[in-house]
């Protein structure tokens, strides 16, 4: 979705993905962390909306891989606004404790601060 006259611009959306499923191909055999990357524009702010059936942990990372913000135990809510500063790409990390399972939906949008 494109922003018109400086409004919100959706830059990423994923609905109802499974977290915590058994997976022999990953270390520890459980896919309890999911990462996503997305392009951003400099000097903007992003907001992440989370909806999950059980609480999950959420972090936003810059293009150097450093955590910019972190929120623990979110079931419904938002993280941000988080300034993009000079980044052109950022990432989202969603995690759950080993052995737990969650169905998660995320949406990320960008707007002028």
What are these regions (language model features)?
Residues 2-15:
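Predominantly extracellular/luminal regions of secreted and cell-surface proteins
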Residues 14-19, 24-28, 51-81:
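Surface-exposed beta-strand/loop patches in noncatalytic accessory domains
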Residues 19-45:
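Non-catalytic, beta-strand-enriched accessory regions in extracellular/secretory proteins
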Residues 33-38, 77-85:
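Exposed aromatic-hydrophobic patches
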Residues 36-52, 58, 90-96:
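Hydrophobic beta-strand segments within beta-rich accessory/binding domains
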Residues 39, 60-64, 110-112:
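Residue-level signal for short segments within beta-strands and strand-turn junctions
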Residues 41-43, 53, 76, 87, ...:
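Short connector loops at helix/strand junctions that flank enzyme active sites
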Residues 56-57, 98-111:
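Edge beta-strands of jelly-roll/beta-sandwich modules across compartments, strongly enriched
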